[in-house]
């Protein structure tokens, strides 16, 4: 699977053969070239083509129905359009902090820090909050 972390200033791309098994990471500035050209460059740098792969893009911005706009970079993400142009079999576009929130339950108690009183309950709702291009927030 071709995976991408698209931030407001930097984008990171890699191939994942299975969950937790991520290969080399290719970085490039966000928005300096058209999106499709950037994806093609990343695939070339990773030594692969898109035709047999699924892709997931975690983007720094609001996502609705598989679409997102990075207004500061001039990139627009449309999962169906990217799949057709790049011949990916499947494309997912998701908010970057939503991706982090989805992974929180996998961390277990060793990978979390309790803030405030009470007992840590890994099954309880958890919050991700952090700076990036803007202020990212997500709940798991």
Task: Please name every model-derived segment.
Residues 1-45, 49:
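Short glycine-rich, Thr/Ser-proximal phosphate-binding strand/loop in the N-terminal lobe
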Residues 15-16, 40, 68-70, 105-106, ...:
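Short amphipathic alpha-helical segments
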Residues 112-116:
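FAD-binding glycine-rich core of flavoenzymes that anchor FAD
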Residues 48-93, 98-111, 128:
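Short beta-strand-loop/turn "lid" adjacent to the catalytic site in phosphate-handling enzymes
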């Amino acid at each position: 699977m071709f995976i991408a972390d698209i931030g407001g200033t930097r984008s990171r791309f890699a191939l994942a053969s299975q969950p937790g098994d991520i290969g080399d990471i290719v970085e490039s500035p966000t928005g300096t070239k058209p999106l499709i050209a950037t994806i093609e460059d990343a695939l070339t740098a990773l030594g692969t083509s898109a035709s047999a792969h699924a892709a997931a893009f975690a983007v720094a911005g609001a996502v609705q129905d598989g679409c997102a706009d990075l207004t500061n970079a001039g990139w627009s993400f449309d999962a169906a359009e990217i799949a057709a142009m790049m011949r990916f079999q499947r494309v997912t576009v998701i908010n970057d902090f939503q991706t982090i929130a989805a992974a929180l339950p996998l961390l277990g108690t060793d990978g979390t820090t309790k803030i405030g009183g009470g007992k840590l309950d890994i099954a309880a709702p958890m919050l991700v909050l952090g700076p990036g291009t803007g202020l990212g927030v997500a709940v798991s």
